[in-house]
């Protein structure tokens, strides 16, 4: 990643720490992955504090595939089977079956309905019966070890929530351009400025976690 493009958001450590602070205060962040990987930017929000307005922004400016990133423990708690037994996707993106809240939604498509589904899934006492399958929210299972084992947006989302001291569940959606194409670094940065959001990279988060673990040891 061209660090010059991101310099206005701080150095790598500052970018992570500012992103964590933003998440603690209920704001969203934008996360870029490697140029040699998907080379895309995702909007990421805390699942426990996301608002209807933020969900509407996500749907309006994103791919439409609103994903809920979960730990393996939460996936098991909700008894969500993986979408396929043999994952042949290029980056091994770990989708489970899609979900809908069993109560409190209409068609499940609106911003409010999708948020209701997410809140049902992350509730402390959530049960499998609280969710219908299929639905309009796409859960993703994060790998144990986070970005240190897989450099994906799913793992970055759960790592960010954990480091921020929040529930380890987050909402992500790929940012798209007005013509429907995927947003890359320049477009992501322009969107961030327009919507007062912070930008960081998965590479920043990997370095931050490695430094933190070295310090702890």
Swiss-Prot record:
MF term (GO), any: 3,4-dihydroxy-2-butanone-4-phosphate synthase activity
Pathway: Cofactor biosynthesis; riboflavin biosynthesis; 2-hydroxy-3-oxobutyl phosphate from D-ribulose 5-phosphate: step 1/1
Coiled coil regions in record: none
Cofactor, how bound (note): Binds 2 divalent metal cations per subunit. Magnesium or manganese.
Pfam families linked: DHBP_synthase (PF00926)
Cofactor section: Mg(2+); Mn(2+)
Enzyme Commission designation: 4.1.99.12
Positions bearing the site annotation: Essential for catalytic activity: 136, 174
Reaction catalysed by this enzyme: D-ribulose 5-phosphate = (2S)-2-hydroxy-3-oxobutyl phosphate + formate + H(+)
Annotated residues for binding of Mg(2+) 2: 38, 153
GO terms classed as biological process: riboflavin biosynthetic process
Keyword vocabulary terms for this entry: Lyase, Magnesium, Manganese, Metal-binding, Riboflavin biosynthesis
One GO CC term on file: cytosol
Binding site for D-ribulose 5-phosphate: 37-38, 42, 150-154, 174
Residues binding Mg(2+) 1: 38
Sequence intervals crossing the membrane: none
Alphabetized InterPro entries for the sequence: DHBP_synth_RibB-like_a/b_dom, DHBP_synthase_RibB
Similarity comment: family membership: Belongs to the DHBP synthase family.
Function recorded in the entry: Catalyzes the conversion of D-ribulose 5-phosphate to formate and 3,4-dihydroxy-2-butanone 4-phosphate.
Assembly description: Homodimer.
HAMAP family: RibB
Record's protein name: 3,4-dihydroxy-2-butanone 4-phosphate synthase
Lineage: Bacteria, Pseudomonadati, Pseudomonadota, Gammaproteobacteria, Enterobacterales
């Amino acid at each position: 990643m061209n660090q010059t493009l991101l310099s206005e958001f701080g150095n790598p450590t500052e970018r992570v720490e500012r992103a964590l602070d933003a998440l603690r205060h209920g704001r969203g962040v934008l996360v870029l992955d490697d140029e040699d990987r998907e080379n895309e930017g995702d909007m990421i929000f805390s699942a426990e504090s996301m608002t209807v307005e933020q969900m509407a922004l996500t749907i309006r400016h994103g791919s439409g595939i609103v994903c809920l990133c979960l730990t393996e423990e939460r996936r098991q708690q909700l008894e969500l089977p993986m979408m396929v037994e043999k994952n042949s996707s290029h980056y091994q993106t770990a989708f489970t079956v899609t979900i809908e809240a069993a109560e409190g939604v209409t068609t499940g498509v609106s911003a409010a309905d999708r948020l209701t589904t997410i809140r049902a899934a992350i509730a402390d006492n959530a049960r499998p019966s609280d969710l219908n399958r299929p639905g309009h929210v796409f859960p993703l299972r994060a790998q144990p070890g986070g970005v240190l084992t897989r450099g994906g947006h799913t793992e970055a989302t759960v790592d960010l929530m954990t480091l921020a001291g929040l529930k380890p569940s987050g909402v992500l959606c790929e940012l798209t351009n007005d013509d429907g194409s995927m947003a890359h670094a320049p477009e992501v940065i322009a969107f961030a400025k327009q919507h007062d959001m912070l930008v960081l990279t998965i590479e920043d988060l990997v370095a931050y976690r490695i430094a933190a673990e070295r310090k702890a040891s």
